Swiss-Prot record:
Disulfide bonds join C322-C326. It comes from Pyricularia oryzae (strain 70-15 / ATCC MYA-4617 / FGSC 8958). Glycans are attached at N144, N393. Zn(2+) 2 binds at D207, E246, H355. This is Leucine aminopeptidase 1. Belongs to the peptidase M28 family. M28E subfamily. GO terms for biological process: proteolysis. The lineage of its organism: Eukaryota, Fungi, Dikarya, Ascomycota, Pezizomycotina.
Length: 401
């Protein structure tokens, strides 16, 4: 939908009615004071930036334009990008089938449906709203419950808020490994109605409630693994549930900006944004599949994910593109970390109900979400088990031959 006239521009005048009287003898002047709308610095493509009002941000989004809001994170990526770093290396073959396949049998649709019914019951999860704050609090408590049910706190597994100034906090769960090298899985918790974000309902069942419950189910099952939950695997694992993705990847930028400054060793980041809608694929006469994004991602990590899908999922993948800054993986990429993104289908056949009051559970397939949960579970376990130092040394040795 591409309306030519902005609804908010008609409803919300930008002029203040305040006047100031100045007196100099018999001389009186009345000066209308114009209230300047707050401006935000956005990046629409690499190096292409502009200053816009918040309403102009939503107008761009209504017209299908994605962007980083870099107002608070102008330096993101400058540290790591300035360093000479070897290309990321990932296993050419999978090795954890004996551990992973029993875990996949534990994944279930019922917990995902229960969680999504609750998550979509908030009027909106708009990141500046009280509902957005409440939904983040609920998510934190639910992740804490998941950890407690697995008795994983005793191994140092924990969850905490990553606080933001706008009210809705991001949520990060950590499963310690033998090293500080970290595998990240992400999804975004906020929803938005692009016509009146502060007022209209935004159930956000698919965008990105589906990604939230998919990753939450993967976490539940992974914590049943004594090897992973007990910290016996090579690498640390983090699950991220980002705030304010819809506002320009604000939450994920804040997190990866912090990680960059801390010189965190993030080996891989996988984003799960929209995992449940298949109807347009079926209507087009095409087979059910997952969409592997191939633009603005790490090529080696993306190839690795294809092997994971081939080995552990029951449906194939299709290659597809989503453009610049299309979801939170872009923040990891900009910070210099290898990232990838898998969506529910070919991008052109993805959910057309998003960002409206109609993004509802009734349009989604929990069987399809289960395929994303399988991929996520396998991705985490395989990479958590990978000795990256050994892999990188072997790769360097081969390149010197």
């Amino acid at each position: 939908m591409k309306p030519t006239t902005s609804i908010l521009a008609l409803l919300l005048p930008a002029i203040s009615a305040r006047f100031v009287q100045e007196t100099d003898g018999d001389h009186v002047q009345l000066h209308p004071e114009v209230a300047e709308a707050e401006k935000f610095h956005i990046e629409l493509a690499p190096g292409e930036t502009r200053w816009v009002t918040e309403e102009e941000k939503w107008e761009l989004r209504r017209n299908g334009q994605r962007f980083f809001d870099i107002t608070s994170t102008p330096e993101l990526g400058k540290t790591l990008r300035s360093q000479s770093r070897p290309a990321a290396v990932f296993p050419s073959k999978l090795s954890q089938q004996d551990a992973v396949k029993p875990l996949l049998k534990k994944l279930a649709k019922e917990p995902m449906q229960k969680h999504l019914e609750k998550f979509t019951s908030f009027h909106t999860r708009y990141y500046k709203s009280e509902y957005g704050r409440q939904s983040s609090q609920w998510l934190l408590s639910e992740v804490n419950k998941t950890i407690a049910d697995a008795d994983a706190h005793k191994h140092g597994v924990h969850v905490q808020h990553f606080e933001h100034s706008w009210g809705q906090n991001s949520v990060i769960a950590t499963i310690p490994g033998k090293s500080k090298s970290t595998i990240v899985v992400g999804a975004h918790q906020d929803s938005i109605n692009l016509f009146l974000p502060s007022i209209l309902a935004a159930p956000g069942a698919d965008d990105d409630g589906s990604g939230i419950v998919t990753t939450l189910e993967a976490l539940r099952v992974l914590l049943t693994s004594d090897e992973l939950a007990g910290g016996k695997l090579e690498n640390t694992v983090e699950f991220h549930w980002y705030s304010a993705e819809e506002g320009g990847l604000l939450g994920s930028q804040a997190i990866f900006s912090t990680y960059e400054k801390q010189k965190r060793d993030i080996k891989a980041m996988l984003q799960q944004d929209m995992t449940g809608f298949i109807q347009r694929t079926i209507d087009a006469g095409k087979p059910e599949s997952v969409g592997v994004i191939v633009d603005y991602v790490d090529p080696a990590l993306t190839e690795f994910i294809k092997t994971v899908i081939d080995e552990y999922c029951d449906i194939p993948y299709v290659e597809t593109e989503c453009g610049y800054a299309c979801s939170d993986h872009a923040s990891a990429s900009k910070a210099g970390y290898p990232s990838a993104f898998v969506i529910e289908s070919s991008f052109d056949l993805s959910d057309n109900h998003i960002h409206t009051t109609d993004d509802k559970i009734k349009f989604l397939s929990f069987d399809h979400m289960l395929q994303h949960a399988k991929m996520t579970t396998a991705f985490v376990y395989e990479l958590a088990s990978t000795d990256f130092k050994k892999l990188e040394n072997e790769s360097q040795g081969m390149s010197e031959l």
